[in-house]
Amino acid sequence: MGGPKLLMPLRPRPWTCRTCLQRLHSARRSLKTAASPSPQSTSFEYNRSAHNTQKSTTDDETLRRVFDSPSFWKEFSQRSSLHTKPTGLVQNQYLTSPEGFRTFANVSLHKCQAIVHKVLAASTLEEYRDMARDLDRLSDLLCRVIDLSDFIRVIHPDPQVQEAATQAYALMFDYMNVLNTTTGLNDQLKKAAANPDVTSHWSAEEKIVAQILIKDFSNSAIHMPPNERQRFVNLSNEISQLGSNFVNAAEPAKSHVVVGTNSLRGLDPLLVQQIKRWNRTASVPTMGMIPRLVLRSVHDEGVRKDVYLATRTSSSRQIKRLEQLLAKRAELAQLSGYASFGHMTLSDKMAKSPEAVSNFLTSLVGSNRQFVHEELAQLQGMKGSSPLQAWDHAYYVHQRVMQYSQSRRSRELSIVPEFFSLGTVMQGLSRLFNRLYGVRLVPQETAPGETWNPDVRRLDVVDEAERHIAVIYCDLFSRPNKHPNPAHFTLRCSREISNQEVAECASMDQSAHPNDGMATAVDPQSKTLRQLPTIALVCDFPDPPATSAGRPSLLSEHSVRTLFHEMGHALHSILGQTRLQSISGTRCATDFAELPSVLMERFATAPEVLSMYARHWQTDQPLSENMMRSMEQDRTAHGSIYGAVENEAQILMALVDQAYHSVPAEAAGKIDSTAIYHQVSQAHSSLPEPSDTQPPTSWQGFFGHLYGYGATYYSYIFDRAIANKLWEDVFQSGQASVDRNAGERYKNEVLRWGGGRNGWDCVAGVLGSGNPSNADGRLVEGGDDAMREVGRWGLGRDGVSG
């Protein structure tokens, strides 16, 4: 792979929570933010001839039944096959067969080439004024193929379709790399952006997109002399290979720890038999689940210590890979004119610099420290007089959790999933969206060929005037060979379609559609055609049992929070509809991208929200207030056992990430990643790694996200701190969680801008100038002080992985 991509930088998902981190989101991208354009309306004319117009109450009941009743879903989904002509995947007119992917890619490629020719030949003032929109459309055409093909090749069960989608993806990806080396595009865009007679006619969105594209060109080394550009490409390829090896070849220095079987008391006897050897010893592996169970269960502290040290000591080969990766990144940054890789990566994020991130993280350590000490004091009391050690934590936490799980309240909570059928939770999401933002979810029959699996449900998002504003495909049930991790995919961004594009399609082919047949609507204000955001939600919930007399798929509280999290991303895409696709929805700064999803988790279990939807699947009885209180007490209890220590662990990982990526190029060749890791641990950990072992522990070799999220690992906890503040001050810790005024305030200041507004402007706007944390609007400026202020907001006690 080459360096960072200009028009559609294919990067890993900007940031994700603990469960998100392993999900496949390669088509998402991190974008930059600048000045603030005026937000666009997200209400469009609803095509009543093509969509269900039943009353919202009927839609609400249908929504529950399409997910909870297999027989109802079968009847509902088969209606369309009787009177609807076949269509392509997600309504794309080309994707009716595997061969259609090639046609789709070639048609899109032809359109791209025409735009490139127009941009390179531009000479008149009018042509330069069109340039930002033209290049945004070029990006959209690339994304149309790459995003959708990348998703289909992962999710579709048919190998022929997978292969066809992979070929379409490769064709457009290769062409994108050609564009990244087309210097004329960069030269023409810079010429347009430097001309006041051009920029005075650009909207604020066009100015932002132009600056984003110029920055992406710069990140692709297009401005460098040929020899330096080639070095940039070579370094990027080396980094890609080293990073892939680092992630995939993680290995401990020792593969096993040999202990006496008698010293494994506390471990499940079946597991002991599994690892037992012939001479009364057992071979404990140092990777996988077994060593975790040993640390959690074995009474012998000496065994726990040996296993702990072995599981946190990487092989010398793995450490060498990491240090080579860090050195190459530092060299790449120096070649690009930056002091370090961290400075290069953070220049277009909310944080702006490694120093600001460190301010945030050290401030966060302080706000979290008291809670950590309280948790460790409880564990120390359980251990007794000898000091609590790092290898003791999992053991005593497990004991406390087991003690709590035997309590009456904990046993009572075993019936909570009975109130969280999947259909009921989807009802709750729709009701919440309607209450806060005036939009709801409407089940829609699919045409033959529209979905990749018969279990996929389509939901149309409509506003209070019954206008269609988005499409969501819900692939939520488990099936063989399906990727198990929950995920949100934007298959197509929102964008304004010009009259010129409509005319172009009409001239090409009578059957051609300006959005390839996918969902469109007319903006009632501007009367322009728009492509609607098309989203896929993928989860792995169990199918409703076939032999349980109508029992639906029931979700744990954790699964409910996960679904709300992913719907938070979807909500950003639904409401963040801009005229240009490069800044629509989730295409915002990396360290702002998780805010809507993290905040959305807080709504899942707020009593005010639970009362709107949590009902027993069989009796329809609402979840009682006593049960809601028990759920809250349960979360508080678990948080008080391990939440703050988990928070500290995440903070330390982010500090290590910053330390590694702040090393300048001249020092990168001598980097000692293990020494840096221990320096951070000793300085900031309340339960630091032992410093006197030989060899010293080197857990950083297992920290695979150093590659995918280099210099940005702080982003999730940063957004979590902001989300906690918004929950407390805007939604009043849940008391305003169904209040329309609070919802409108959040929508207007945060969601509807997509990536078209600086994240600090969004935070300052939603908090208001009267908030003590934003006195006189000081958060707007961002910088070190603002980052430190966010650190003071803290993370609460739920634990990052809660």
Swiss-Prot record:
GO cellular component: mitochondrial matrix
Cofactor: Zn(2+)
Disordered: annotated span: 28-61
Signal sequence, start to end: none
Keywords per UniProt: Hydrolase, Metal-binding, Metalloprotease, Mitochondrion, Protease, Transit peptide, Zinc
Matching InterPro entries: M3A_MIP (IPR033851), MetalloPept_cat_dom_sf (IPR024079), Neurolysin/TOP_dom2 (IPR024077), Pept_M3A_M3B (IPR045090), Pept_M3A_M3B_dom (IPR001567)
Pfam families (alphabetical): Peptidase_M3
GO biological process: peptide metabolic process; protein processing involved in protein targeting to mitochondrion
Record's subcellular location: Mitochondrion matrix
Compositional bias segments (type: Polar residues): 33-56
Catalytic activities: Release of an N-terminal octapeptide as second stage of processing of some proteins imported into the mitochondrion
EC identifiers of the protein: 3.4.24.59
Cofactor note: Binds 1 zinc ion.
DNA-binding keyword on record: no
Transit peptide: 1-24
Residues bound to Zn(2+): H565, H569, H572
Principal localisation: mitochondrion
Catalytic-site annotation from UniProt: E566
Similarity comment text for this entry: Belongs to the peptidase M3 family.
Stated name of the protein: Mitochondrial intermediate peptidase
